[in-house]
Regions:
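Active-site region of chymotrypsin-like
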Residues: 15-31, 103-113, 142-236
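Short, well-ordered loop/turn sites that connect or cap secondary structure elements
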Residues: 41-42, 123, 192
Length: 250
């Protein structure tokens, strides 16, 4: 299977340049927990993930929130600056801070961010799709520290059904059923078709051994009626950002 991605610049890169694992934890105690996956949609650290991964079991926003970003062979721990979420769809849009965490200190460092083009074209039933996410990730205690093993995994499948009104209590907005194997931790990862993002991993059902995987994703077009925070509590619509070329959506 293809192991590289084409980014906004048309460059072929390792997928972990544009897709990242999400953590929560404490930088002082160095105790972290792996949560899910996210992916970049603009060069400044704007990203998308699934809405449900941004909240804990008590329906409170995850705090603190960290992203492990890889850029040009180096790894950075970046904090969340802010995020917004769709009122119905399982989508959240966030911005990472340009301050990284290094040896328990906060350092402002400009980081080049490779990001995806988004597709406005609705896929068809039986279209082949794939995802790259971090379900096989672990954080292992090692004395006074922890060692993170973040292993990105490709999965592919086909689109099997479209539900314009959602599937029920969990997915109340338009969604697609697929045969992509979505494991725990892959929520929030990108669904790709012909090199562009068409959706976000949302949920999956456990199947018996040998059965075809059953999973669902939210179409990326659901972000078009959202607005995001820009600067100091200013807001712009996603459509405005697209028209300004700050999000590539075609």
């Amino acid at each position: 299977m293809e192991r590289v991605l084409k980014t906004n610049k048309g460059e072929e890169v390792s997928p972990n340049e544009a897709v990242f694992p999400i953590l929560t934890g404490d930088i002082k105690t160095k105790e972290f927990t792996f949560v899910a996956t996210g992916f970049f949609i603009n060069p400044l650290g704007g990203f998308i993930t699934a809405k449900h991964v941004m909240f804990d079991d008590n329906e409170q926003p995850i705090n603190p929130f960290f992203a492990i970003q890889t850029s040009k062979g180096k790894t950075y721990l970046r904090r969340l600056e802010h995020f917004v979420y769709h009122s119905v769809a399982d989508i959240a849009i966030g911005m990472l801070s340009d301050v990284i965490i290094k040896k328990n200190k906060l350092i402002k460092v400009p980081i080049e961010t490779l990001y995806f083009q988004l597709s406005k074209n609705a896929p068809n039933i039986k279209d082949e799709i794939k995802t790259f996410a971090y379900p096989e990730s672990t954080i292992i205690p090692d004395g006074k520290e922890q060692i993170g093993a973040f292993n990105g995994v490709w999965q592919n499948g086909i689109i099997e059904e479209f539900y314009p009104n959602g599937t029920g209590a969990f997915l109340k907005s338009p969604c697609y059923q697929t045969s992509v194997l979505i494991l725990g931790g892959a929520s929030g990862g990108p669904i790709l078709h012909k090199g562009k993002v068409i959706g976000i991993n949302s949920t999956a059902f456990k199947q018996l051994e040998g059965e075809t995987p059953l999973s669902f994703f939210t179409p990326i077009t659901e972000i078009l009626d959202m607005s995001v925070i820009i600067g100091r509590n200013k807001r712009k619509t996603v459509k405005e950002l697209i028209s300004e070329g700050k999000i590539l959506f075609n």
